[in-house]
Amino acid sequence: MRPLRSIFLLVAASCMAVAQEAPVPGLAVLPGAVNGAFIERNGKLLAVYGDPSGNRPGAGMVLITHARRDVVWAARSLLAKGAKAVVPEKEADLLVRPEKFWGEFREKRFHDYAQRSTKVPIEAIRPDRTVKEGDTLEWEGLSIRVLETPGYTRGAVTYLADLGGKKVAFTGDLIRDDGKLQDLFSLQDAIPSARIGGYHGWAGRLGDLVTSLGKVAAERPDVIVPARGPVLRDPRAAIDRLLARIRSAYSNYLSVDALRWYFKDGHILVKAQRVLGPDARVDWMPMAETLPLPDWIVPISNSRLLLAADRSGLLVDCGGAKIVEELKKMRAGGKLASIGEVFITHYHDDHTDALPLLAKEFGSGVTACGSLVDVLERPGDYRLPCLTKNPVAVAGKRRDGESWRWKEFKLTIHDFPGQTLHHNALLVERDGGVAAFFAGDSLTPSGIDDYCLQNRNFLGEGRGFLRCLDIVEKLPAGCLLLNQHVGPAFRFTPEQVARMRETIRKRTLLLADLFPFDAPDYGLDEGWAALHPYSVAVAPGESARLALRITNHSPRERTFRAAPRPPEGLTAVPAGPVRIAARADGEIGITVGAPPGAAPGVRVLAAGVAWEDGELREWVEALVEVRE
């Protein structure tokens, strides 16, 4: 076998990559979209993560820290050349049987409240061995210990080895750079100890990640080789910085957390203490004033009925059959004459599932504006939380800010990207009476509703909740705020609105320190890159078009490229690079083809996205059905 140094020179020449200086004797790290770490011993090679160049002649073994396809792709070339794979026991099923996950996910992506990241592998990896906490691998006289370090994923591990008199930790995506995280959306999860489900668990595995960082710190490694980013030569300082950044950002988040209204202080303190420590206290914003609903607003489950003087009705949202049944009872009892229109605040299934039934019973037309319209009409084209399977035609396609008269009311619709990016709000001003603002699920008396990161909550002036607060601040004096999951109406004081605004602005700065990107939204918004439509069908001998949709969150124009990786039996050809202005959207077309004779069935197509100074391999996916 060639000496390690000469091999790396060969790799560098062939792929224009340069290996970092070896952090310790016998260890070399090849940087890339994922790092490749190589240990040489007795003329043999062991790899951690894999080979980002794809040009290595081989290795005897590959250690995999976690089951993310945007990481494990780097191991594929070595495994094809005969390397044996070692994988975490708790994530082995995702690696060994990814087809099981994807087979179920075709339906589970609808009504999805679990919010597991979809960066699940697509191609199976057959491990030679699985490992768990306390295991030791023996390789060429080298003992490699295993720590379970969940956080970035549910079952990740860290590998520890003494090399050249130095303790080296291979920590996967647990930490990177000088104490940063790759993102927070990958940590969305349930928090069982606080009785909080996956949908409500904003970065729910932060508590696990904090514990895992403590375990790694207790080992006192001299060097950390992460899956991404530079080698860490002062691990203790980097871990301390990351812990401080996490706790500052989490404290900020909790201080205006809408979930406090629903779950009360005790549950929120449980999740706070997992991250902030056992003595944690939260500097909560005071609760907003609550007020009774006026008699012309009728609560029906999580819908609200506006009742005009002539007994005509306008409904806000319709998520369940029981709502329609109650409306039928009101009609039969003479309290309700008709419902000609239903306004939709957002696409979540608990607000939209029964719209077809409502239309059948009352002939009600749907009203919405902005990006919400397409999600309502084509929910299956999206990968978003809480999707309904029931598309509806939007008869009343309004413009943001448009006003119109309905009976004795003036109505004004707003694009209101709060709880979700695809969200509307409705200002209702009754002639001679109080005004009411239907904010959907975006606000509660305790603050802002951004607890599901997959909903796409943007930071920055004029975006996300800052845009929403701008609208709230301009509402008529005394205007009531309504969230249909909250019984009473409520009002924020000017001081509360100012506090929420300043909290979000501070959060922007805190997260800029936490993430490795030039805009913190890349670490919050999993949907900044997505294949659209999420599910397509193609016949053998034909093709279909996908688009890699990209939101350039950066403060400057960027050029993006698509790198599709079609599954066996399909082709995928991307269009050329696209230049997208700062904080704007763009897309790259991808033509997906099925050759004549292609076997029927559903396949998963992944695509990477790259820009001037970054790359994420196999980052997005779409489901492609080959029809019979």
Question: Which residues fall in each region the model found?
Answer:
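Low-complexity, acidic Ser/Thr/Pro/Gly-rich terminal tails and inter-domain linkers that flank the onset
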Residues: L509-A539
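Short acidic, flexible loop segments centered on an aromatic residue
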Residues: P555-G569
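Active-site HxH/HxHxD metal-binding segment of metal-dependent hydrolases
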Residues: L27, P52-T136, K322-R405
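Short, surface-exposed loop/turn segments at beta-strand-coil junctions that are enriched for proline
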Residues: G593-A599
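Asparagine-centered strand-capping/turn motif at beta-strand->loop junctions
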Residues: I550-S554, A594
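Short proline/glycine- and polar residue-rich coil/turn motifs
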Residues: V578-G586
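Conserved beta-strand hairpin/beta-sheet module of binuclear metal-dependent hydrolase folds
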Residues: Q20-R56, T158-G172, R176-D177, R281-R331, ...
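Metallo-beta-lactamase
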Residues: L45, T136, S143-R236, R241, ...
